[in-house]
Amino acid sequence: MKLPIYLDYSATTPVDPRVAEKMMQCLTLDGTFGNPASRSHRFGWQAEEAVDIARNQIAELVGADPREIVFTSGATEADNLAIKGAANFYQKKGKHIITSKTEHKAVLDTCRQLEREGFDVTYLAPQRNGIIDLVELEAAMREDTILVSIMHVNNEIGVVQDIAAIGEMCRSRGIVFHVDATQSVGKLPIDLSQLKVDLMSFSGHKIYGPKGIGALYVRRKPRIRLEAQMHGGGHERGMRSGTLPVHQIVGMGEAYRIAKEEMTAEMDRLSMLRDRLWNGINDIEEVYLNGDIEQGVPNILNVSFNYVEGESLIMALKDLAVSSGSACTSASLEPSYVLRALGMNDELAHSSIRFSLGRFTTEEEIDYTIELVRKSIGRLRDLSPLWEMFKQGVDISSIEWAHH
């Protein structure tokens, strides 16, 4: 077993060797290196064919028509294109958007930008387990609501939203429904031929494909219109200009093909490993599971260890690559905004660790993790005056600390 152990698969995944091999065939002179928009020679045709195959592989995993897949530079761009594109196109119908407080920053900050441009955004607070209350969502819908954006799976706590039910609510009112599926694609079955979802964002690098590539699903029936955000040569049916990066697209396609083949067995395996990890640490005193194990994906476990500082815990666990909060915001010492939105106090939010498992995680690594976490928590609490006070029955929240 090699140290450190990678348990941060929700931040990014290593590229699967089968994916890397396919990508290598699209880079050099003897490979498929052409520009797919070059219609006048074989190099262009071959590149276009490689892109078509990948587009089909992605569409097949999610039950879409390949013509509904628009390539972007990643899920962040897909979220921006979906939300800004739909808001700008449909603004004559209304300027009200609904999202939730636990969305990824790519959705939240896009909505903030639209607020600066005169749109009105409602940010729903989820229930304590992270699930959106559908009654509250329905109550927030107005005559001028044009767009609802709710993620499928949360990147920090792994809870799954009922996008089928939300889709029905939106469709019956003629509201465009966008779903960020970055963390769910390849982990949960998605069938866009059945779901009433209009726009869906995908990433390559969360599913053993390369970084720098993503896609946006844009429904054809009923047809959803977007205002382009990237202008140029009119690629991707005018929705996203820019020369298509064939090697990245081929890599993403192969990653989605593998996911379709292996998803069911792999999720059973990860479910077992996640349960093994949770069962190995849940008897430690003052340990809390964040989210909802029943309504969660099998690869994410977010746990708070009360009376232990999250940063010191991460230092103690230096043989484990884990995160507190998401990678996109973890450089700041602010506690996770997702956990705060669940109504958690700052101290408990600060002591949270996200373990995310993946394709190359082994049982041996999980057992090592359990042992290391148990030892580290014990050691850090031995050093903690707060833990000592808690053990003596002092109500820490009632203490007034002196400020120097």
Curated annotation (Swiss-Prot):
Q: Its GO CC terms?
A: L-cysteine desulfurase complex
Per its UniProt record, what InterPro entries does this chain match?
A: Aminotrans_V_dom (IPR000192), Aminotrans_V_PyrdxlP_BS (IPR020578), Cys_deSase_IscS (IPR010240), Cysteine_dSase (IPR016454), PyrdxlP-dep_Trfase (IPR015424), PyrdxlP-dep_Trfase_major (IPR015421), PyrdxlP-dep_Trfase_small (IPR015422)
What cofactor does this protein call for? pyridoxal 5'-phosphate
Q: Which reaction does it catalyse?
A: (sulfur carrier)-H + L-cysteine = (sulfur carrier)-SH + L-alanine
Q: What GO molecular function terms would the record report?
A: 2 iron, 2 sulfur cluster binding; cysteine desulfurase activity; metal ion binding; pyridoxal phosphate binding
Q: Which residues bind [2Fe-2S] cluster?
A: 328
Subcellular location, record wording: Cytoplasm
**Chain residues that bind pyridoxal 5'-phosphate:** 75-76, 155, 183, 203-205, 243
NAD among the record's keywords? no
> Which pathway, metabolic or otherwise, does it act in?
Cofactor biosynthesis; iron-sulfur cluster biosynthesis
What are the record keywords, sorted? 2Fe-2S, Cytoplasm, Iron, Iron-sulfur, Metal-binding, Pyridoxal phosphate, Transferase
N6-(pyridoxal phosphate)lysine: residues carrying this PTM: 206
> What EC number(s) does the entry state?
2.8.1.7
Provide the GO biological process annotations.
[2Fe-2S] cluster assembly
Q: Where is the active site?
A: 328 (cysteine persulfide intermediate)
User: By its UniProt entry, which HAMAP family does this protein fall under?
Assistant: Cys_desulf_IscS (MF_00331)
Assembly state and interactors?
Answer: Homodimer. Forms a heterotetramer with IscU, interacts with other sulfur acceptors.
Entry similarity comment: Belongs to the class-V pyridoxal-phosphate-dependent aminotransferase family. NifS/IscS subfamily.
Q: What does this protein do?
A: Master enzyme that delivers sulfur to a number of partners involved in Fe-S cluster assembly, tRNA modification or cofactor biosynthesis. Catalyzes the removal of elemental sulfur atoms from cysteine to produce alanine. Functions as a sulfur delivery protein for Fe-S cluster synthesis onto IscU, an Fe-S scaffold assembly protein, as well as other S acceptor proteins.
Name of the protein in its database record: Cysteine desulfurase IscS
In the UniProt record, the gene name given for this protein reads iscS
